[in-house]
């Protein structure tokens, strides 16, 4: 039976997953730009995804600091 994921492991996984989503969205924006399609909505979504990534990274850092104390 697999061990339960710790809060720190889960936060690290969430960071990695969100980084992958951001990369995919960046690729979508770039492809749309190359094809001459509007990118306003895709760029707005990318900005929101970046904000979420920042928040998740902050949470991970707080967990790491708590663990070190």
Would you name each region that the model predicts?
Residues 1-69:
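Anionic, Ser/Thr-rich low-complexity intrinsically disordered regions
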